[in-house]
Amino acid sequence: RTDETGYTTRVGLEGAYANYLLGTKGRRLEQKIAKGQWKLASGFDIIEPKDGYDVVSTININIQDIAHHALLTQLKKYKAQHGCVIVMEVSTGEIKAISNLELNKKTDTYTERYNFAIGEAHEPGSVFKLMTVVAAMETRNIDTTYVVDIKDGKQQYYDKTFQDSQHHFTGRISLNKAFSVSSNVGMTELVHSLFAKNPSDFTTQLLSMNLNQQLGLPILGEGEPFIPTPRDKLWSGVTLESMSIGYAVKITPLQSLAFYNAIANGGVMVKPRMIKEVKEWNKTIEKFNVEIINGKVCSKQTADKAKGMLADVVRRSYGSGHRLYSPDFSMAGKTGTARKNYANADASKLSYISSFAGFFPVDNPKYSCIVVIHEPDRSVGIYGADVSGPVFKSIAHKIYTNSLLMDTVEDVENVSEKTTKNYEDYYAKAAKYKTVMPDLTGMNVMDA
């Protein structure tokens, strides 16, 4: 990246770890002699150049390839403006894949030009509902059976009307169902009933979960998250309700994923990491270990309840992510569909952000993943489950099918004596007779 003064800063890992990669320049004094030749002028003032170290990244090239092409497929299908995907290992925070693609309108192709996953803070929409229910459970001692009234799918606070995009239920339903169907009215009713008199209780809990803080990545350009508080000048009578469904707040995809990963990790938030170690040939110079950002974004009990709610989004027939369900492997996550320019009075010019965040498998999660796609063509589709969800499912499915599965075979008590003797005879012969491979050096394939 070149600034206005002409100074060039490398982006990505090269820029973040330049102090390891660059090495040091050498120096020696030489004298020009006849015929344009040079000779060493002095043997005392010599500084030998030193190669830079090798940086070992956490990226898994197989998962990276899967994630990149899954994202590219959906971007093309929905004619989207740009998108990103991140896959992270739950227990360690190691980034296994990260892809950022943007449409080049001149060539009508998708290329990597900007790191949206790390740098783009935006209103996340419904994926933020996880943060809302976790904050509610932590501060008001409620659980998934707490009842909210979603009425007929519409609710007005002051001059703003909140409504559900899809109507599965009406009236009083459990918080778990409201979350599963991604009810906007259910979430606004939840925070209004619990926090309307003391909204600072809600925002304070969000702040305690590190949602207003950058992750402190070594890579330049991390986006700045924003969580409003009642003390802010722009706080209004509907800010609390707007926050509950992922508006009036800003957060980057990686910051969102760090929170989802914390829920999968029992409430422990680990720092996303892209480097394993620094090496010089086979010698380890520095090793990067797991770093805990927040040892308790919520209690393990709350995390377990939240995991169950995220699982129901996919496995329940009425869940907003049920179309992603597979009987072959388990997934948990949350759909998101956010309006980008909702202040525009012309509804025909609205654009959307489609997202899906979650983890897999449900029991003992191994990987967390987030997919965010901006401005899909409205005529093709806009909903998170349709646009971004298939990227998540494709990644989870291919990782699952490519994983080495080892089955434990129990010892058999009644073993045939004849079979046992046959095996003993075979191993005895194998140990006695040695096979010699002929020397085929220098021979072509046909002769060999």
Task: Give, region by region, the residue ranges found by the protein language model.
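N-terminal leader/targeting segments and the immediately adjacent pre-domain N-terminus
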Residues: 45-76, 414
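Beta-lactamase-like hydrolase cores
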Residues: 62-89, 208-211
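Small/polar-residue-rich segments within soluble enzyme cores
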Residues: 1-50, 371, 390
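Beta-lactam-recognizing serine transpeptidase/beta-lactamase-like catalytic domain environment
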Residues: 32-46, 50, 59, 85-125, ...
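Glycine-rich loop/hinge motif
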Residues: 416, 421-448
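C-terminal, active-site-flanking charged/polar segments
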Residues: 363, 374-377, 385-402, 406-409
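Conserved catalytic/cofactor-binding microenvironments
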Residues: 404-422
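Serine endopeptidase catalytic core focused on the charge-relay Asp
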Residues: 11, 15, 61-74, 185, ...
